[in-house]
Amino acid sequence: MTNAESRTVLRILDANANRAGEGLRTLEESARFILNDLSLTERLKTHRHDLAVAMRRWNRFQLIGSRDTPGDVGTGVQTASEQSRADLSSVIAAATTRTQQALRCLEEYGKTADSEFAACIESIRYQCYATFRELELKMAGLNARSRKLVEARLYALIACEPNADYLKARIAELVDAGVDVIQLRDSSVDDRTLFEQAKLGAAIAAERDVLWIINDRADIAVASGADGVHVGQEELPVDAVREVVGPERLIGLSTHSIEQVRLATRTTANYIGCGPTFPGKTKSFDRYPGCEFLTQVSDAERSGELTLPAFAIGGIGLGNVEQVAQSGIGRVAVTGALAPHDGLHQTAMGMREILERVPLRITPDSSDVCPLPND
């Protein structure tokens, strides 16, 4: 190559080494702070380190000396999509694409002067393909659950069934009736039974495209492959539960006052249950915050103070769901009203019709991923 050609290659290598390093660091931050995934974070850091080692085969001062940012015509070429990112997944998608392309450029132009360098970059590139795949799939799973959650209207709580066939039938009738989220709640069975039904329910729910939540038991939620866990004010703190279930799964938290709602927004909870609204048959309480509490929650949503989906709970059925809707809440969690009976489908559809009159302020666009722990 001529001196001019060699200098051009150095410019290309310098630009793409910077681009690949920046992309890898962006992805490392996502694995570290969004997913809290130690393995992915370590692997991305290793890729970044391996790239730095490979670049040592080139004289750093020659690389820097070849750099001509003011004279680079490419710095002024931009597209509209480069200036915005729809959500965190789009940040990751852009970074993986940019990194892969930069590595390929390093490999191809490196072949003109150093075949061993090119081979090193090729190895890094293939390792990155595997890492990036895992990273994007984990982000996709996290986003899919969050999107389903914020679009949900009807949440049913059920107990364990006598056998697998009964559980399949129970889930099927709820899904067919328009239920979006199903929680398995049963303190009367042993752990093995709860786990087996939780695992079966998780598989069925995934097939039917509904969310499957386990009450109280974060360990069983993880072991069974459930979408999340719901805890009360007396159970493990939300941030401790997050340590168990990881960033991919949803966490719901029961709240009984506007003060507890405000505290919930400072945790990594994904949604809240608000109540009890009315007296019900499954649980008894000393006091019922009622629709006055729901109005406070709705006001908090309207003001932007609350950015978590809120489900009214407690004694709600077709006969009183209108009061919930008038409070400004368009999501409910139900037990008795959706217990097996001949009119279950009509009850669920009737409740849903009323709830859908209430606009959802917490939308997929405003809550694309689960809340993240503080850095």
From Swiss-Prot:
Mg(2+) binds at D216, E235. Keywords: Magnesium, Metal-binding, Thiamine biosynthesis, Transferase. Residues 1-127 are annotated as: Unknown. One of its GO terms (biological process) is thiamine diphosphate biosynthetic process. Its cofactor is Mg(2+). 2-[(2R,5Z)-2-carboxy-4-methylthiazol-5(2H)-ylidene]ethyl phosphate binds at G315. It comes from the Bacteria. The keyword Transferase applies. Binds 1 Mg(2+) ion per subunit. One of its GO terms (molecular function) is thiamine-phosphate diphosphorylase activity. It catalyses: 2-[(2R,5Z)-2-carboxy-4-methylthiazol-5(2H)-ylidene]ethyl phosphate + 4-amino-2-methyl-5-(diphosphooxymethyl)pyrimidine + 2 H(+) = thiamine phosphate + CO2 + diphosphate; 2-(2-carboxy-4-methylthiazol-5-yl)ethyl phosphate + 4-amino-2-methyl-5-(diphosphooxymethyl)pyrimidine + 2 H(+) = thiamine phosphate + CO2 + diphosphate; 4-methyl-5-(2-phosphooxyethyl)-thiazole + 4-amino-2-methyl-5-(diphosphooxymethyl)pyrimidine + H(+) = thiamine phosphate + diphosphate. One of its GO terms (cellular component) is cytoplasm. Its EC number is 2.5.1.3. 4-amino-2-methyl-5-(diphosphooxymethyl)pyrimidine binds at Q183, L184, R185, N215, S254, K283. Pathway: Cofactor biosynthesis; thiamine diphosphate biosynthesis; thiamine phosphate from 4-amino-2-methyl-5-diphosphomethylpyrimidine and 4-methyl-5-(2-phosphoethyl)-thiazole: step 1/1. It holds the Pfam family ThiD2. Belongs to the thiamine-phosphate synthase family. Condenses 4-methyl-5-(beta-hydroxyethyl)thiazole monophosphate (THZ-P) and 2-methyl-4-amino-5-hydroxymethyl pyrimidine pyrophosphate (HMP-PP) to form thiamine monophosphate (TMP). This is Thiamine-phosphate synthase. It comes from Rhodopirellula baltica (strain DSM 10527 / NCIMB 13988 / SH1).
